[in-house]
Each structure stands twice: as structure tokens, then as C-alpha cells.
């Protein structure tokens, strides 16, 4: 650390607002760059406090903890830059008033990802470091696509780091790479709408918006603001990739040069560079629209050369959907998005498709736990919004007993009606907004059961589900009313499923 520079009285003073994972990374980076630090958080014991104290001496940081519902404007005194945590909504208190005061004083407001973008620009100038950069956003599927894209890239012999919302924070990963003298060939960033609000100068080779459905309306205020936050990413990318099935993402590229747009979807692709699904003789395939057979060598272009004309091309079958280890149509679409991102780097199909076959998915995302009595148990605890749960219901291809409920975050639950009517035998309701979901689903005629906790939910679901069906935990809600986070909720589900198996004498 640049402790000498950090302690200089004339060094710039940076205010870190919010001390979660990204706040700690930003604080460490700013200290490394020679800034003085002031840190403020609404909590007395924010999650990143111990981590920051472990790497920075107490004298290097001015702490203001337990600020509660109000940040004192005096926090801005002497500050040249304010780094905002993605956990604090800029349009809501306690951050809104302080941010307005910062802007009126001419203090720059930015986020950790913007600092990362500027760090890459500095490294390009100082060390001629010019990595490729791919970025992923969307309501659902971000982590799966980010992790899978990294795996595809590494299978082709390039080094890659996945960072951002997926964890670790982008700056934390960059500092680790610098310290290890192991800067990667490619960065793959998962970016939330929160992070994009404070990012302005990222330069991506390609970026994808996977989908936009209701989520985080308690943070953004309305769907328009939420979609606009996602759309910001495509304006910072050379190639914009969107979901043809999602009108909101298609609208984001309405004014973009078509040569710089790629798309994926459930239907057959029509233009060179697009991807989709083909149902042939009862077998679903991942397909790409290519100008030539995919086993021919790729003609390399100069980096800044415009992409070729996107005319109608030749359909290439890549692999059967059933060959994927990740389940559901939504995951087939995630696979297409990852392939498109990696394909922008002009990587060959062969290694990527082999890596795609091997990819087993991420924890708590439509993850198969086990079968008991012919019933599959699926952990989709990461399904924290209505869109994710609809995707899981429609993608599994099984009748399910759904376990849903938790903190609803101000969502409209009505989009669940159609998917539940078509795919669910029953719904077991848990958590604070379980009753609200039940109220919406009453008109479907699907059986509704209320459970006090996960143990009861799993047991009641097991009583209802029939052989060949699935018990699906996909809550459509956040978890904090009952659990530490969604991984904790998923782990409790897995434990209860394993306990059920033991009780029934089924041991793996």
C-alpha cells in the first residue's frame, strides 16, 4: 500500500459511501493510489469493516459509522471524489440529500466499476496493457453467463478473470492480478443496474443485456428507470448483444448501427452472427447463423475494423440442448449469450463447445439437488424476482410443486399466474410476502399451501409431488426476512431435502 502517500495532508480526500464488498475494494484502490480516505456507512458494523481494517492502518482511514437514516453534509468537507456503494439508491435517502449536496459543491460522484474502468485506461498508458473486456447485465442469468463465458475463453487458451457483481469486486480482482503479475487477457464483468448507474467510461468489446423483468423497483422507482440503467451498458460497448424474445432489450438497440448488434432467442436466427434454438425431429439444438461452416478457419480482422455486413447466413447446428448439464430453456439461452460474447473475440467453436458440455452451473441457480421417490428437487434460491421464477417454471419442462415467498421488493406478482397455471401442481408459500403471492394465485385454481419454515415447506411439497415431477425452490423474492442471504436459503433447502431422503431411507 502507498501508506506514505495516503498519510500526506495534501493528498486528495475520497469519501467512500457504503462499506460492503465494493466499498472495501474502492477504499483499498484509492489508498493504493495515494488518496486519503473517509468512510461512512449507515451501520455500526458494516460487512466490509473487518476486511478494510485488516489491510489499512486505522490512521489511514477516517471512519463515520452508524450514520443511520442521515448522512451529515459535513462528510463532504474537503472531499474531491465520492465513491457510492451500489447498495445505496442515489434517488432515495439516506444517500439522495448527500449526493445532491456533493453535486452542488462540484464533487465527482462515481462507483467502483468506474474506478476500475479508469484504472484500465491508466494501465493502457503506463504499461501498454490492452485486455479484451466483455460485460454482462440483465435481471436474470448474469452470474451464469459471466462464469460460463470465462470458462469458454479459458478453454480456448486465453487467461480470463470474472469479476464485478459476481464477486470478487472488479478492483479487488485487478489488485490481486497486479500483485501476482498476472494481468489477464480478458476481463468478464457482471454488472448490476446499481453499478451501471455510476459507471460512465467503461469500454467493452461486447456487452449483453440478457433480459429485463421487474426487480429492484424499491431501488430504481419504476421499470423505465430500471431498463435505462441496464441500457447504459450497451452504449459503452463496441458490439451490443440483446435477447430477441425481450422487447425491452430490443428497444435498447433501435438506434444502434445494425452491424454492431447481435441477438439470441428461442427462435431461429436470421442474420449472420445471431444465435437461437432449432427444434428438429424432436431434438432441440443450439444454432448459429454463420457466413460459412464453423469448422473453417476464422479470418481475423484488425481490431478497429468494422464487422462484416450482417446478411442472411447459413445455419450451423452447434450442439443438442440436452447435451448441456445446466437445465431448462432459460439456461440454453444463457449458453447462447455466453457463446456470442466469446465469439466476438473470434474464438473457435470446438474448444468452446467442449467447455460448454462440461459446465455444471452455479450454486443455487436451478441446481439439481437429488431425486427422492422419483421426484427431482431443484434449488433455484437465486430466483429472487418474478422473472427468474417464471423462467425456471417454463424452462424445467416438468410439472412442479413450487416453493415461493420472502421479501417481495415491491414487485407485481401477477406474471406468475400464467406460468403457475401451466406448470405447477401446487405452490407452497413461505415468508413475509407469501400471502401476497397466494392472493395473486388464488384465481389459478392451483393448490396453495402455507408453510412456517423451509422444513415444513419441503415436507408439504414432498407429500404433494408425484413421481416424474419436481419440487422447485424458486421464491421470486429476496431472502432477508428469514435468512442471511439467498445462498443461506438455498443451503437450508438442500439440508432439508437431504434430511427428507434420510427419513425415507434413500441415501446416495
Curated annotation (Swiss-Prot):
Pathway: Cell wall biogenesis; peptidoglycan biosynthesis
Keyword match Cell wall biogenesis/degradation: yes
Disulfide bonds: none
Pfam families linked to this entry: Mur_ligase_C, Mur_ligase_M, MurD-like_N
Keywords: ATP-binding, Cell cycle, Cell division, Cell shape, Cell wall biogenesis/degradation, Cytoplasm, Ligase, Nucleotide-binding, Peptidoglycan synthesis
Subcellular location: Cytoplasm
GO cellular component: cytoplasm
Enzyme class, first EC level, given as a word: ligase
Domain of life: Bacteria
GO molecular function list: ATP binding; tetrahydrofolylpolyglutamate synthase activity; UDP-N-acetylmuramoylalanine-D-glutamate ligase activity
Catalyzed reactions: UDP-N-acetyl-alpha-D-muramoyl-L-alanine + D-glutamate + ATP = UDP-N-acetyl-alpha-D-muramoyl-L-alanyl-D-glutamate + ADP + phosphate + H(+)
EC number annotated for this UniProt entry: 6.3.2.9
Residues annotated as binding ATP: 138-144
A single BP term in Gene Ontology: regulation of cell shape
Position of the signal peptide: none
Classification via HAMAP family: MurD
Family note: Belongs to the MurCDEF family.
Stated role: Cell wall formation. Catalyzes the addition of glutamate to the nucleotide precursor UDP-N-acetylmuramoyl-L-alanine (UMA).
PANTHER family per UniProt: UDP-N-ACETYLMURAMOYLALANINE--D-GLUTAMATE LIGASE
Protein name per UniProt: UDP-N-acetylmuramoylalanine--D-glutamate ligase
Naturally occurring in which organism (per UniProt): Bordetella avium (strain 197N)
Name of the encoding gene: murD
Amino acid at each position: 500500500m502507498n501508506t506514505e502517500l495516503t498519510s500526506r495532508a495534501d493528498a486528495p480526500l475520497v469519501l467512500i459511501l457504503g462499506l460492503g464488498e465494493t466499498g472495501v475494494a474502492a477504499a483499498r484502490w484509492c489508498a493504493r493510489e495515494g488518496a486519503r480516505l473517509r468512510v461512512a456507512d449507515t451501520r455500526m458494523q458494516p460487512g466490509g469493516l473487518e476486511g478494510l481494517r485488516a489491510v489499512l492502518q486505522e490512521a489511514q482511514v477516517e471512519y463515520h459509522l452508524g450514520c443511520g437514516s442521515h448522512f451529515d453534509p459535513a462528510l463532504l468537507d474537503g472531499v474531491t471524489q465520492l465513491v457510492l456503494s451500489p447498495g445505496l439508491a442515489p434517488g432515495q435517502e439516506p444517500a439522495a440529500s448527500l449526493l445532491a449536496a456533493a453535486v452542488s459543491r462540484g464533487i465527482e460522484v462515481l462507483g467502483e466499476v468506474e474506478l476500475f474502468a479508469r484504472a484500465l485506461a491508466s494501465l493502457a498508458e503506463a504499461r501498454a496493457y490492452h485486455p479484451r473486456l466483455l460485460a454482462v447485465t440483465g435481471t436474470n442469468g448474469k452470474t451464469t453467463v459471466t462464469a460460463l463465458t470465462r470458462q469458454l475463453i479459458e478453454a480456448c487458451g486465453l487467461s480470463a478473470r470474472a469479476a464485478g457483481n459476481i464477486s470478487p469486486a472488479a478492483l479487488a480482482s485487478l489488485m490481486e492480478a497486479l500483485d501476482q503479475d498476472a494481468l489477464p487477457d480478458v476481463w468478464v464483468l457482471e454488472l448490476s443496474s446499481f453499478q451501471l448507474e455510476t459507471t460512465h467510461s467503461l469500454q467493452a468489446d461486447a456487452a449483453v443485456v440478457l433480459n429485463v423483468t421487474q426487480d429492484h423497483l424499491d431501488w430504481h422507482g419504476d421499470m423505465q428507470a430500471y431498463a435505462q440503467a441496464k441500457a447504459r451498458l450497451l452504449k459503452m460497448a463496441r458490439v451490443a448483444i440483446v435477447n430477441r424474445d425481450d422487447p425491452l432489450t430490443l428497444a435498447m438497440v433501435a438506434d444502434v448501427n445494425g452491424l454492431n448488434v447481435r441477438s439470441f432467442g428461442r427462435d431461429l436466427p436470421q442474420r449472420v452472427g445471431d444465435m437461437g434454438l432449432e427444434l428438429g425431429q424432436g431434438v432441440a439444438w443450439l444454432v448459429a447463423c454463420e457466413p460459412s461452416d464453423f469448422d473453417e478457419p476464422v479470418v481475423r480482422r484488425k481490431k478497429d475494423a468494422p464487422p462484416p455486413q450482417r446478411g442472411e447466413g447459413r445455419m450451423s447446428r452447434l450442439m443438442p440442448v440436452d447435451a448441456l448439464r445446466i437445465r431448462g430453456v432459460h439456461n440454453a439461452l444463457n449458453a447462447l449469450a455466453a457463446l456470442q460474447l466469446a465469439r466476438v473475440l473470434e474464438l473457435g467453436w470446438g474448444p468452446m463447445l467442449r467447455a460448454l458440455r462440461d459446465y455444471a452451473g452455479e450454486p443455487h441457480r436451478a441446481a439439481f439437488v437429488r431425486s427422492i421417490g422419483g421426484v427431482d428437487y431443484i434449488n433455484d434460491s437465486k430466483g429472487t424476482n418474478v422473472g427468474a421464477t417464471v423462467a425456471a417454471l417454463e424452462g424445467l419442462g416438468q410439472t412442479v410443486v413450487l416453493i415461493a415467498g420472502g421479501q417481495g421488493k415491491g414487485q407485481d406478482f401477477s406474471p406468475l399466474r400464467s406460468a403457475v397455471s401451466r406448470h405447477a401442481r401446487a405452490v407452497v408459500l413461505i415468508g413475509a410476502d407469501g400471502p401476497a403471492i397466494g392472493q395473486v394465485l388464488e384465481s389459478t385454481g392451483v393448490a396453495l399451501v402455507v408453510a412456517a419454515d423451509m422444513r415444513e415447506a419441503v415436507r408439504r411439497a414432498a407429500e404433494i409431488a408425484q413421481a416424474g415431477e419436481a419440487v422447485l425452490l424458486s421464491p421470486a423474492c429476496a431472502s432477508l426476512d428469514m435468512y442471511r442471504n439467498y445462498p443461506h436459503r438455498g443451503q437450508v433447502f438442500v439440508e432439508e431435502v437431504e434430511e427428507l431422503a434420510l427419513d425415507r431411507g434413500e441415501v446416495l
